[in-house]
Amino acid sequence: YDVYEKLYERRSLYQIKLLSESIKELKFNFNKQVCGVIISKEIQNKAGANYEHVEGFTDFFRSIEGVQVAYCIIEQNYSYRINFRSRGKYIINDIAKSFGGGGHKLAAGASVDNLSGSEIEDKILRILKGKINVN
């Protein structure tokens, strides 16, 4: 249990502060089936944290009732890291591949250095629009 607790049940105060700031910026789309956030340097600085403190955030957002797909766009030093998670209704590794990344059907990611956070988010939502059934 000690190893499990150290790995999965301990969060630093910086992580909690960053999670709190990220939740304030969380956006929902497609009848709340998709949620995501851009975790900018500004948000990270406000929390006294950095991009390394976002571990588990995408899984947390995916756990919100009704959410099928969650994404986090994390600003790093000179690029953005994108994390995707799906509950299984929608496959998301093709979205990561469209950014030069990869992964599994339900958990994938990419790094991007030639687009802004909002440009990345716009592209994600355009791709998801073709997948998500909003009826």
Residue ranges and their predicted role:
Residues 1-98, 103-135:
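Hydrophobic helix-and-loop "lid/oligomerization" segment in the mid-to-C-terminal part
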